[in-house]
Amino acid sequence: NNMLHSVRDEYTEKKLISYGFNNVINTSCPTTWELTEEHISDIDHSKSKDVVFTLTDYGKNYEKDTLMVNDLKDNYRNVYFWPQGLHDMSYFNKLAINGINVLAPSLPTFEKILIEENIDYVGTRLHAGIKALQLKRRALIIGIDNRAIELSKDTGIPVLERENIHNLPDMINKLQQLELHIP
């Protein structure tokens, strides 16, 4: 068979090859392909005054997610929550954190705030972080599973593993020099 199967990270490529699939190529996630050196050169290196964040309803960690949101409140002037998934809002409500601006759960709403405001993205939704980078906004993805973590290993997309969430204030306050390596 001369057809190739595209995968988004080296981990998946090696795993499939170990199972005997030799027609595999790591092309990274197609959503990253436009993140060229020229594109990312327009992304601010320093922290914005405002932030939009996401949570993931199927990857709950009440303690660490509460710490994340409170750290965002401590380090940004305005904090916005964008519920991407169907049950993200109910999860956010269970955290019982006040003082958060809640956005409508639609992609156009998320895109609008990224385009119109000087704002950072921090959150557990991988592709929300990639969307922020596509729209030339500073982003820090909180890695809750191997997808974001493995993609970061290959590409350099900024990811902080949730188990290290205590490092969030340092990560958001330091200058972020993006050096991406998209296959």
Briefly describe each language-model feature range.
Residues N1-P183:
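Active-site anion-handling motifs in enzyme catalytic cores
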